[in-house]
Amino acid sequence: MKKILTIILCSALVVISGCDNYDFAQEQFRKEVNLLSNSSLVYDRQVAELQQGGDTLFVVASLSGSQATDEPVTVVLQHSDTLLRAYNKSNFDINKARFAKYLPEECYEFPTMEMNISAGSSKAMFPVYLKNLEKISPDSIYFLEYKIDSLRTPDCNPKKRHVLLRIHKENYYASTQTATYYNYTSSTVIIPNPDGYSEVRRPTNSNRVFPISENSVRLMAGDENFTDYTTALDIINKGSIILEMGAQLPENPLAKELTILPYQSIDVVQLTPIGEYDNTYLLNVIRTPDGRSTYYKEFRLHYKYRLKSTDLYREVNAKLRYQFNPRVENL
């Protein structure tokens, strides 16, 4: 009986071993070329750094299958214009003011439309050189659109041969990929009235900050209310200011000079520093007695502004903080 059981077990092991050899030694899936994207054919996982010389994003072509290719596979791309229309219809219907746009030609270079997926590899990365991103609006959505040339790349997946490459941008202070909010702390907005009295508001809300260039951001000048950011573009354009960071302060290496500028038509005047409202950017590290540290990116501002020439100036003393983890940002 023991001999019979031994024979059965040995036979089973031989069969399993044979199956393992078949599973791992042979290709189990058809090899097809795909363009990396989500279920909506959008690829939005990359962010362009606003910096001198621009930055590089990639359109990624991948090869399906359980085994790496043993010979090069040529992938040829083409420009396309079908997905953007569908994207706008699906997301914004007839609200044309919010339609996504193609990135202007002056803002990118696409050096090659043909690459190989090398033998032993599973992907090819088409570089997109981005530049002049400070010229595009932080309030608009921008894409580049490509598709696989199926005549010159015959083994492509027809369901994954198109891609919309979303153009996000960021600098050290803010990003368009995820909304960046700075919180008002110990801030006041002084609103004069024609009768000579002034109303003092103490905002405790947050202010969304947008990257403009490598060293500048945009934000609302005051505490004006608007119900929905996506429908308040005119108010935002008229009521926004630019903060432009400059040289490091010699007396404090964690602080930088800061200049306050108009974004569009707003009348803004940078005022003489008062106490901690000294028109600087500060990397503020607050330490507790037990040794823990909390890190803030902080704008310390003193200015006045008005939206129309007939308005009285509103004076702002603001400290805007954004808490962050430097270890996470440096990953």
Predicted segments, located by residue:
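C-terminal motif of bacterial Sec signal peptides marking the signal peptidase cleavage site
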Residues: 15-18
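Sec-dependent signal peptide recognition
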Residues: 2-10
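Beta-strand-enriched, solvent-exposed domains that form extended recognition/catalytic surfaces
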Residues: 118-125
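Intrinsically disordered, low-complexity regulatory regions in eukaryotic proteins
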Residues: 20-112, 125, 129-143, 149-331
